[in-house]
Amino acid sequence: MQTATEVKDTSRAFLIEWIIDVHRKFRLLPETLYVTVYIIDSFLSLKQIKKSQLHILGVTALLISTKYEEIYPPELKDLLTVSENKFTKAEVLQMEKDILLTLQFDLTAPSAYRFLERFRRVSSIVGHEEKVFFFAQYLQEISLLDASLLKYKASEIAAASLILAAKSLKKVNVWNKDMEKAT
């Protein structure tokens, strides 16, 4: 997925890092983060925006994803507050409309998080599973910052993060027959 904007990879990375911080502050579900980043990247691949519009895109993508994933999404006024009231409610709602129409309401795709959850169920990792999967999830979050990884499938990101986490923590035989079948 390539972006059709003046937005540089570093600007995108700063935005995603800020979204991760806000995501943690509101204690949102992990999948909400992945949906937010998917919305941002999908929108940027289809529409040109100015660098100055990147922040409102991020806030609005987070708003949309929380409506989609969360039982109790944060209120728009709370998202505006963490954005230091840089834009109005009307501006965010207009951006929401623009995103939804541009993406034709296609807001999700299988995420690396979901694949990691699947791999967790079929994995042969014995002992310290929580530590391995927590580390793999952390690696996946880091991967969200790097636009050069957009060319890889979510399943590949999940598999790579799991292998790297397991190898880093000295776990062997991560890939059993069930994992081969799952991937």
Predicted regions, residues:
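Acidic, serine/threonine-rich low-complexity regulatory regions at protein termini
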Residues: 1-183
